[in-house]
Structure formats: structure tokens, C-alpha cells
Amino acid sequence: MTVEITKYPDRSQWPTLMRRAVAETQELHDTVASIMAQVREQGDKALRELALKYDGVQLGDLAVSPAEMQQACDQVSQELKSAIDQAAANIATFHKAQRMHELEVETSPGVTCCQRAVPITRVGLYIPGGNSPLFSTVLMLGLPARIAGCSQVVMCTPCGRDGKVNAAILYAARKCGISRIYKSGGAQAIAAMACGTETIPRVSKIFGPGNRFVMEAKMQAQYNKVAIDMPAGPSEVMVVADGNADLRYVASDFLSQAEHGPDSQSTLLTTHEALALRLPQVIDELLATLPRQEMIKKSLGHSHIIVLHTLDEVIDYVNAYAPEHLILNCEESEALARRVVNAGSVFLGPYSPESAGDYASGTNHTLPTSGYAHAYSGVNLDSFTKKITFQHLTKQGLAGIGHTVETMAQAEDLMAHRLAVAVRLDK
């Protein structure tokens, strides 16, 4: 499989090279809108009908019972439990460190302003199932929700045709203290959390990855006054490597990204043409040892190897592209990292593969894709809170800023605003 190599492209060519795979269509929008409407109107009945239609699953009880949870946890090997436990510990440590103290400041005499982080009461987590049940995502979403103090955490995940949820997903959920787990997947699960059904409660904010139907459902959920973590598209990695980089490391980073899905995109940026020319062969050699080769090949088909003149150009390209994952596999990694302003998560040095962040380093793997890192952050503790501001003014405090408020209100022709100050100051 040959990855396209582009040498020294002019800046006018960059937008073409930066294009992501986009699958937004009117048909997709309409299909999801129909699912949303069906769930809104028919509730649990719609969830059962849609599970049978799309997944061939005959659903019984939608909720995972305590007995099912225990049975699933008993099935998880001790080795995997230990791995999940270590990952959970690191993720919890990093997210606990993000706690912010309440802010209080006197802006002028007698005027006190405060800001307090308040947890979102009820959040919904979507965990994909299918061929790659993402139990790691349970940790990435469930642990911050618990640390933030969300009192109600609802989780939806599809079950298999045997009616069972993946055992590792349930073990990870128990690790996070999640007990409200429902057997529902796809766009209909998002609809259930956005609208509420007889069994699944409506939530205030929805988190989690998924296919294009899930992503479209999350976008449409916002019409129902439900917040989402972020817009999302296919996963992506950008690798910056110098002439000293081990090609096996670079190739394995390409391949680990490519196995996320056929629309995933991997990009190498380098100023070393010789490295760029050798990389495709190493990719092919490692690919031959892996499963899912056909899907990986599709992903590599719209991936890029790009040779640029200077590191300044490399950084400009990185910041213009705004990658979900950025690997700096080069001697200048720390210096370059300080110049990165648009990226979801950055991995410094040869021993920092994306896989570490995907699972166990402690950072969150729910990150902005498709260029949204220009403005969005990855999921963090703040994602599960809202910031409420408070102000307390004494009479003297109001007197101190009263003339300013009255003058500004009058200039905006909002005379009732002016009056609200004047009556308090006996004017």
C-alpha cells in the first residue's frame, strides 16, 4: 500500500492536502432526524424496533441489571482488570489535578464577584460497541464525571445479539461508579438521552464517540436543548519526525491511527526527504503483520507524507491543520511544542505514542477532530461543570459604580436598567 508522498508543496496547495474525509449528506441528516422523531414519539418501543432493524438485536430489558453487571465483571481476566485499574488510576490522577478553587475578587470597594464551578447534574455517556467495544472511553468519560461531582451519570452502549453488553465495558463502568447503564446503540441511543424515554432519562449533556450517524444525532440533539462535548469527525494523527526518528515508530503510529476506521487520516511532516521516501516500505512491512488490513489500507489511501523545507513551515502546517493527535518525534520536540497553538493532544519524543494517551497516560482521549482544535479543547474536568458567577454589592458598592451603570444604560437607551440603579440610590 503506497501512501502519497508530496515534496515541498507550495502553501497554495496546503488546503487541498489538509482535506478530511467528509460524509455529511442530506440523506444522513434526514435518516437521523427520522430516528430522533421516532424515539421522541415512541420511546422504548422505538428503541426496540430500531435495534432489531439496524442491529438484528431483540432487546429484552433495556437496563443492565446488577446481576448482569456482576456476571460480566467476573468474566474479565485478571490481566485486563489490572490494566484497566492502572489506566483508571492515571486518568483519575490527571483529572483530579484539574480541580479549580472558587474564585472571589473585590473588583471595587463594596463590589464582590465570585465564580464557582458547579457539576452538571445529569450527563449521558455513549460508548460504542461493535467490533471494537471502547471500554477505554468509559474511563475517559466516567472518571471525570465522577470527579467533577455529576450526581447522575447515564450510559448507553449497544449489546450483542445475545443481549449482553461487553464485559470489559461493564467492568470499566463499575470502576467509574456508573450503575445506570442501558442497552441501546447508534443514533437512537443519542435520541433517547436527548429526549428521554420511559426507561432512559433525559440528560443535559451528551459525551462520547461514534460513527457518522451517532455524530449527526449529537448535532441534532442540540435542537432539543441538550449540550454535547464537541463536534467530531474521523480520527486523525499528525507526526512530525526528523532524520533520527525510528521509522518503525513512525509507521506504527500511522497504522494505529488507520485502524480506527476507513476515514481516519495520518500525516507525516518532515524536512528529511530520505525518511519520507523510506517510510512507505516500513508501513507495508508492519501492515502485513496486522489484522484489519483492508480497512487500514482504505485509511492509508487518503493519508499523506509531506516533505517541507523548514521547521517553521512544519509548525505553520501543524497549526493550520489543527490535528486531533500530534506526535513530535524529533530532537526539538519541546521547543516545537511551545509553538503549537492548534492541536487536541500533543505527544513529545520517541517514546510517546498516541496509544499511550488513548489508554493509560492519564490525558483524555476524547479530542476535537476535523480542524475543530482551532477552537475546541478535548474533554476535561471543566467539560462536566458549568461556571456560575455571583456578585454581591453593598449600598456603598452600588453607589461607587452607580453613575457608570446609569450613564451606560442611558447611552444604550435602556432606561429601566438606569431606573433599577436610581431607585436603589434614592434618586
Predicted regions and their residues:
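N-terminal Rossmann-like NAD(P)+-binding subdomain of aldehyde/semialdehyde dehydrogenases
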Residues: 1-121
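Short acidic-hydrophobic, aromatic-tinged amphipathic segments that line or gate anion-handling sites
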Residues: 2-9, 180-185, 305-310
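Flexible, glycine/charged-enriched surface loops at secondary-structure junctions
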Residues: 100-107, 227, 264-269, 289-299, ...
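Conserved small-residue-rich beta-alpha loop and adjacent elements
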Residues: 105-171
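C-terminal core of ALDH-fold dehydrogenases
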Residues: 319-427
